[in-house]
């Protein structure tokens, strides 16, 4: 695994949240950034997932962000609905 690997997930609904959880539990990245137009959902999903992975041996940093975070992202997942 590359160090400091950032994954940005656009869309904090069911698909984006489950994708973030799977990535967290498989120790694939160091940081997961949620982006969603519903800022309350974005924040609550990030907080819930951060609580879920808190006791993992190497839990990623989970936070909310904006589209500038996509610039240095290693992977961008688009899970936003149409």
What is each residue range found by the language model?
Residues 12-13:
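Glycine-rich Rossmann-fold phosphate-binding loop(s) that bind the pyrophosphate
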Residues 16-17:
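N-terminal Rossmann-fold NAD(P) dinucleotide-binding loop
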Residues 23:
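Aromatic pocket-lining residues of Rossmann-like dinucleotide-binding sites
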Residues 31, 35-72:
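Conserved N-terminal Rossmann-fold NAD(P) cofactor-binding segment
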Residues 74-77:
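N-terminal Rossmann-like NAD(P) cofactor-binding module of classical short-chain dehydrogenase/reductase
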Residues 80-82:
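Conserved NAD(P)H cofactor-binding loop of Rossmann-fold oxidoreductase domains
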